[in-house]
A protein has these predicted regions:
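Glycine-enriched, solvent-exposed interface loops adjoining structured elements
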Residues: 1-209
């Protein structure tokens, strides 16, 4: 078996494990399922991303890759962190006083982030969030990501457990789901350990809106 380092080597290893050479077209679908599941389950420090936007009304659309918010702040001097409140509390605040000023609270509901008070002028808003795991593809520049670089076993076992229903063999799913769950728990534990042994890596800030 070849070392798993990228998109193609993952496909090759999945086929080798299953002793098949006709799965090239379906393995990428399994990769996508693994990426989607782990995007929901993991809150790894390598998933942290940052984005900025000009906040000039009470609503702003979050980044399309967002799976969970971590922090929202106004890039004032000094920076001002917004406090998260529930949509119900936001509604109560609006009902009592639809004020304008420097935003101090936010609520996340569906595809919108709402702030309160409504901004009295344009502010630069910075959002720190957990983003989806970038999909790996055959396209140049997209054949690897942090998950396959640091945790290729999770990708492999996640793909292999998807092979069971496709091949009509439940034992494949049972076996590799066990390995997959072990790998996921090790990723979570590794991230927990590293949070207390060093700083969270710096992330590039993208512009939204």
């Amino acid at each position: 078996l070849a070392k798993i380092t990228d998109y193609q080597s993952l496909i090759d290893n999945v086929q080798d494990y299953l002793n098949r050479d006709d799965l090239t077209s379906v393995v990428p679908t399994w990769m996508g399922i693994v990426e989607t599941e782990l995007s929901r389950r993991l809150r790894d420090r390598r998933m942290i991303s940052r984005a900025t936007a000009t906040l000039d009304n009470q609503y702003i659309k979050p980044p399309s890759t967002l799976v969970a918010l971590r922090n929202i702040q106004l890039n004032t001097d000094p920076p001002s962190t917004l406090t998260q409140i529930t949509p119900d509390v936001m509604d109560d605040k609006r009902a009592s006083s639809n004020a304008f000023g420097r935003p101090a609270f936010y609520s996340h509901l569906g595809q919108q982030i709402e702030v309160y008070p409504s901004p009295d002028t344009g502010h630069t808003l910075e959002i720190a969030y957990y983003r989806t795991i970038p999909a790996i593809t055959a396209d140049a520049g997209q054949t690897t990501n942090w998950l396959i670089e640091y945790h290729p076993d999770a990708y492999l076992y996640g793909c292999l457990k998807q092979a069971g229903p496709y091949l009509g063999d439940q034992s494949i799913t049972t076996t590799f789901n066990t390995y997959f769950e072990q790998a996921v728990q090790q990723i979570i534990q590794h991230d927990t350990d590293t949070k207390f042994s060093g700083r969270t890596p710096q992330t590039a800030i993208t512009r939204i809106g």
